[in-house]
C-alpha cells in the first residue's frame, strides 16, 4: 500500500499517485475520505483504503467512490451496513485492533465478538485485519514485539474459530525495515516511499529523497553595519553585507522557527537565512560573494558539493522529516521530472 495521505507527504497527491499507479502499486492509503475522492476524480481506479476510522458523514463518499475503510466500533458496523443497504452497496472493511498505540482500534479481547458481529452484516465484506506499530523506528523492539504478539494471538484465535483471515497489514515503513519477516500480506509504505530511511540504526541502500524545493533570488540589496533585517530586528548586521530576498516563507511551509537557523544553497555554497522568516519571503546573507537576481536557490536538494534534505532541516528544530515535507503548502507548485 502506498500511503499518499497529507498530499502524499507533501509531494503532491495526484502527481505522485498517478506515477505510482503506473509503476504497479497495489493500492493506496489515505487518512480521510476527501483525499480518496480526489484520487477517484483524477481517474485512479486502484483500491483506496481510508486508514482513519470513518465518521457518519464519510459513508456517502465511501459508497459512491468505492472506498475501503478501517473500522473499530459497533457503531461503524451498524451505520456502514445501514447506509450500504439503502444504496444496495457492498462496503469493504478492515478491522483495526488496538495492540498498544491507543489511538484507534478495538480492544484485542473483543476481537472474536467483533468479527462475529461483522459477519452478521451481509453488505459488509471483511477485506483486511490490521494494527499500527508505535515504536518501529526504535532500536528497542520490546514494545513492538509485544504488539506483534498480541496481534497474531488475535489472528490465531480467529483461525481456531474457523475464520478465513483476509489481508493482514501492520507494518509501516520502519516496521518493514525493522522486522521484514512480518511484512507478509501487505505493508503500508509511507516516508520510505519518498526516499527517506526512517530508521537511524539500520542502513537502507539506494534510498534517496525524491523531493527538491527550489526558488530564485528575487532581489538584492546592500546594507550597512548596524542595520537590521525583517520583522522584529532579530538580525543586526555586524558588517556591511549583501542581502538576497527569496520568495518563500512560512505561508509555503518554511517554518518561522527556522529563522536565523537554516541555510540555503546558492551557486554551490550554503548561505544563512537571516532575520525572521516572513509569510511570503525570507532573506539570505550573501556577504560579499557574487550573486545575481534569478540565481537558483536550493532549499531542499543539492547543487555542487552541497546538499540538504528534510531530515537535515528537521534536525535544526528538533522535529521529524514528516513534519517538514507535509507542511509544504499547496501554493508551492509540484513538478515531476
Q: Language-model features: where?
A:
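Active-site-proximal beta-alpha core segment in soluble small-molecule metabolic enzymes
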Residues: 1-169
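Active-site anion/phosphate-binding pocket segments in diverse small-molecule metabolic enzymes
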Residues: 34-35, 54-56, 61, 72-79, ...
Amino acid at each position: 500500500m502506498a500511503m499518499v495521505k497529507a498530499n502524499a507527504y507533501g509531494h503532491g497527491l495526484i502527481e505522485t499517485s498517478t506515477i505510482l499507479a503506473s509503476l504497479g502499486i497495489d493500492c493506496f492509503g489515505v487518512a480521510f475520505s476527501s483525499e480518496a475522492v480526489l484520487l477517484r476524480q483524477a481517474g485512479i481506479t486502484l483500491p483506496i483504503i481510508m486508514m482513519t476510522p470513518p465518521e457518519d458523514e464519510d459513508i456517502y463518499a465511501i459508497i459512491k467512490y468505492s472506498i475501503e475503510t478501517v473500522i473499530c466500533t459497533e457503531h461503524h458496523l451498524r451505520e456502514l451496513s445501514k447506509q450500504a443497504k439503502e444504496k444496495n452497496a457492498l462496503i469493504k472493511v478492515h478491522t483495526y485492533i488496538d495492540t498498544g498505540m491507543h489511538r484507534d482500534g478495538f480492544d484485542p479481547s473483543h476481537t472474536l465478538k467483533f468479527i462475529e458481529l461483522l459477519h452478521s452484516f451481509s453488505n459488509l465484506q471483511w477485506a483486511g485485519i490490521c494494527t499500527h506499530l508505535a515504536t518501529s523506528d526504535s532500536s528497542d523492539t520490546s514494545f513492538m514485539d509485544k504488539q506483534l504478539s498480541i496481534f497474531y494471538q488475535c489472528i490465531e484465535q480467529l483461525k481456531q474459530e474457523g475464520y478465513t483471515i483476509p489481508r493482514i497489514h501492520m507494518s509501516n515503513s520502519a516496521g518493514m525495515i525493522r522486522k521484514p519477516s512480518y511484512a507478509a500480506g501487505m505493508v503500508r509504505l509511507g516516508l520510505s516511499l519518498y526516499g527517506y530511511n526512517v530508521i537511524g540504526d539500520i542502513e537502507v541502500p539506494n534510498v534517496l529523497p525524491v523531493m527538491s524545493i527550489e526558488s530564485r533570488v528575487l532581489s538584492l540589496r546592500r546594507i550597512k553595519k548596524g542595520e537590521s533585517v525583517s520583522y522584529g530586528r532579530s538580525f543586526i548586521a555586524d558588517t556591511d553585507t549583501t542581502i538576497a530576498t527569496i520568495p518563500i516563507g512560512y505561508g509555503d511551509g518554511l517554518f518561522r522557527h527556522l529563522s536565523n537557523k537554516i541555510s540555503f544553497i546558492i551557486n554551490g555554497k550554503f548561505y544563512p537565512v537571516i532575520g525572521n522568516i516572513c509569510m511570503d519571503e525570507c532573506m539570505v546573507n550573501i556577504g560579499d560573494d557574487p550573486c545575481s537576481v534569478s540565481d537558483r536557490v536550493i532549499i531542499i536538494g543539492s547543487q555542487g558539493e552541497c546538499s540538504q534534505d528534510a531530515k537535515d532541516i528537521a534536525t535544526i528544530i528538533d522535529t521529524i522529516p514528516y513534519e517538514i515535507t507535509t507542511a509544504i503548502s499547496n501554493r508551492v507548485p509540484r513538478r515531476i521530472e
